[in-house]
């Protein structure tokens, strides 16, 4: 009986995925990092002059506004940047 109860608890924890955190790509998309609590967006920064080449990627709490020189792209799913 104890084994069955323990099994149910483990299955519940795995299914609920307690403590889920966002994963965002680093500058090289092959590598990623797990975002700390409160950082619930992934971001990617481009220079407007070279829009195909990202300058920086990571985790952020609020998406900054783009400017004339820098464009920010933010998203909220795993490795979306």
UniProtKB/Swiss-Prot annotation:
Shows cytolytic activity on many different cells by forming pore in lipid membranes. In vivo, increases heart rate or kills the animal by cardiac arrest. In addition, it binds to heparin with high affinity, interacts with Kv channel-interacting protein 1 (KCNIP1) in a calcium-independent manner, and binds to integrin alpha-V/beta-3 (ITGAV/ITGB3) with moderate affinity. Residues 1-21 form the signal peptide. Disulfide bonds join 24-42, 35-59, 63-74, 75-80. This is Cytotoxin 1. Keywords: Cardiotoxin, Cytolysis, Disulfide bond, Membrane, Secreted, Signal, Target cell membrane, Target membrane, Toxin. It holds the Pfam family Toxin_cobra-type. The keyword Signal applies. Monomer in solution; Homodimer and oligomer in the presence of negatively charged lipids forming a pore with a size ranging between 20 and 30 Angstroms. The keyword Chloroplast does not apply. InterPro entries: Cytotoxin_Cobra, Snake_3FTx, Snake_toxin-like_sf, Snake_toxin_con_site, Toxin_cobra-type. GO terms for molecular function: toxin activity. GO terms for cellular component: extracellular region; membrane; other organism cell membrane. Expressed by the venom gland. Gene3D superfamilies: CD59. It is found in: Secreted; Target cell membrane.
């Amino acid at each position: 009986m104890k084994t069955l109860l323990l099994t149910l608890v483990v299955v519940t924890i795995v299914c609920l995925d307690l403590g889920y955190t966002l994963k965002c790509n680093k500058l090289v998309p092959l590598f990623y990092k797990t975002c700390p609590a409160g950082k619930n967006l992934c971001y990617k920064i481009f220079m407007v002059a070279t829009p195909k080449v990202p300058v920086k990627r990571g985790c952020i709490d609020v998406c900054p506004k783009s400017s004339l020189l820098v464009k920010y792209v933010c998203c909220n799913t795993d490795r979306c940047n």
